Amino acid sequence: MTKYVFVTGGVVSSLGKGIAAASLAAILESRGLKVTLLKLDPYINVDPGTMSPFQHGEVFVTEDGAETDLDLGHYERFISTKMRKANNFTTGQIYESVIRKERRGDYLGKTVQVIPHITNEIQAFIERGAASATCGEPDVAIVEIGGTVGDIESLPFLEAARQMSLRLGRNSACFVHLTLVPFIATAGELKTKPTQHSVQKLREIGISPHVLLCRADRPIPDDESKKISLFSNVPEDAVISVWDVDSIYKIPQMLHDQGLDRLICEELRLDPQPADLRMWSELVEKLQNPKHEVTIGMVGKYVDLTESYKSLIEALRHASIHTSTKVNIEYIDSEELEANGTASLAHLDAVLVPGGFGRRGTEGKIAAVRYAREAKVPYLGICLGMQLAVIEFARDVVGLKQANSTEFDPNTPERVVALITEWYDREGKVEKRTEDSDLGGTMRLGSQRCPIKPGTLAEAIYGKDVNERHRHRYEVNNRFVPQLEAGGLVISARTPSEDLPEMMELPRAMHPWFVGVQFHPEFTSTPRDGHPLFKSFVQAAIACQQARAGAKA
């Protein structure tokens, strides 16, 4: 029978509930337990797919094609269990499901209310999500409840968790509350009152936390821990200090050293093997002792909010671990390149253009592509980054001066990139779209496998085929591919069913390392193994740096 750990947050948002939940899962997995995680988001949107990156940050895509919260990316990076659509749901999905049932007559004429109908539906979604775990029936399901205790939006979820805990009985569920212990510089001390009030608010709705994770910018002294214990009615050894660190991969060891996994296992009556966190220690050791150092420029329009590129940043960090390289990421606003030119890119060892939407800043990104191609600097284009690389090549090498995407210019006569109107999803069903289709849930999504052209750089990186996740509406137009190939561009991977270009590259005679991918490889990168594409990209940056140094010598 699956046991449940509910993770709640208090005082302020963005304290790191997702990292805390994922770290706990990593420790429990290291003890031989099968673990899955779920994220409950209180907003009314059906999913984050149409939300602005400035509002929500990154949208993480699962293997089965769900657009989900970025915390699911943390979950997959910390444990071996893969996430699915059922691992993340929102208030919007809950209400949509309940209203659909009411319209069908499932409630037999009853008045449909938040309690019991909404709360029952939340519990059903939780149990369904746990049951669908890719690891089989999990020993533990960790359920992260988004938002902050005291928010109106979170109340149905907290009430559902309380009811579920009561229904399952003692030792079948426990609550971990993440809270803030701020340091007041003028007073020169940490303040415990916000934590006391947050726990009090939680207890008012019938939930008494078993463990407190106290976030601060420094370790919390024993005196403050004792005060928190006394006023929160939580045992002193269950008040755990979680201070700021330079790498999130240090968190599992930090929590284990303070006995978090022991407390959870005791409360849930689990008796697993001892924890083995050597992998995490080795990762941190490699991260802190690099042999090389490179600077990679990430050119985008959301660079002021790096949460928009969370998985991409982590993928580069994973590559740094597995290539013994310190990777410095320099965030470059593409609109500044439009205004000021590309002179600011001259010191970079590699250029990366990530995915994105909309016309704003695209000409600056195209300028960055042109610089990387002409200067022979390693280039990686992801999703939109591949499309822009094709547009730049079409304009500046092939001579199609009006080449563009219909996303940016619907009337362009040279539609090098255009809307995909028909494709097969991962189950083999035909999907069709038009310019008038809804924005939400209408993209090509999820993992799809395709063969790789022999003798290419792509084959050297991936092998015979590639299986990566997608999130896009636009695709390189096959009508222009013969002209592009005549100019030297190589389409190194295509989908087997629709013949859509998946990867492009320049031959090594034209450029040492220039790759574009229509998919999002960052979603499958983990600290355990890294990712072959990002490892190759970082190695190319090292080679570029060394060649440049040799030329100067």
UniProtKB/Swiss-Prot annotation:
Residues where UTP binds = S13, K191, T192, K193, P194, T195, Q196, K227
- Catalysed conversion reaction: UTP + L-glutamine + ATP + H2O = CTP + L-glutamate + ADP + phosphate + 2 H(+); L-glutamine + H2O = L-glutamate + NH4(+); UTP + NH4(+) + ATP = CTP + ADP + phosphate + 2 H(+)
Enumerate the active-site residues: C383, H520, E522
Annotated residues for binding of Mg(2+) = D71, E144
User: According to the UniProt record, where is the region Amidoligase domain?
Assistant: 1-270
Q: How is its activity regulated?
A: Allosterically activated by GTP, when glutamine is the substrate; GTP has no effect on the reaction when ammonia is the substrate. The allosteric effector GTP functions by stabilizing the protein conformation that binds the tetrahedral intermediate(s) formed during glutamine hydrolysis. Inhibited by the product CTP, via allosteric rather than competitive inhibition.
Q: Which UniProt keywords apply?
A: ATP-binding, Glutamine amidotransferase, Ligase, Magnesium, Metal-binding, Nucleotide-binding, Pyrimidine biosynthesis
Q: Which Pfam families match?
A: CTP_synth_N, GATase
Q: Which Enzyme Commission number(s) are listed?
A: 6.3.4.2
Q: Where does ATP bind?
A: S14, L15, G16, K17, G18, I19, D71
Spell out the Gene3D superfamilies in the cross-references.
Answer: 3.40.50.880, P-loop containing nucleotide triphosphate hydrolases (3.40.50.300)
Q: Name one GO molecular function term.
A: identical protein binding
* Gene Ontology biological-process annotations: 'de novo' CTP biosynthetic process; pyrimidine nucleobase biosynthetic process
Among PROSITE patterns, the record links this protein to: GATASE_TYPE_1
Give the pathway listed in the UniProt entry for this protein. Answer: Pyrimidine metabolism; CTP biosynthesis via de novo pathway; CTP from UDP: step 2/2
Question: Which residues does the annotation say bind CTP?
Answer: S13, D151, I152, E153, K191, T192, K193, P194, T195, Q196, K227
Print the miscellaneous field.
CTPSs have evolved a hybrid strategy for distinguishing between UTP and CTP. The overlapping regions of the product feedback inhibitory and substrate sites recognize a common feature in both compounds, the triphosphate moiety. To differentiate isosteric substrate and product pyrimidine rings, an additional pocket far from the expected kinase/ligase catalytic site, specifically recognizes the cytosine and ribose portions of the product inhibitor.
Which HAMAP family does UniProt cross-reference here?
PyrG (MF_01227)
Assembly and oligomerization: Homotetramer.
Function description: Catalyzes the ATP-dependent amination of UTP to CTP with either L-glutamine or ammonia as the source of nitrogen. Regulates intracellular CTP levels through interactions with the four ribonucleotide triphosphates.
- What is the protein name given in its UniProt record? CTP synthase
Which organism does this sequence originate in? Burkholderia thailandensis (strain ATCC 700388 / DSM 13276 / CCUG 48851 / CIP 106301 / E264)
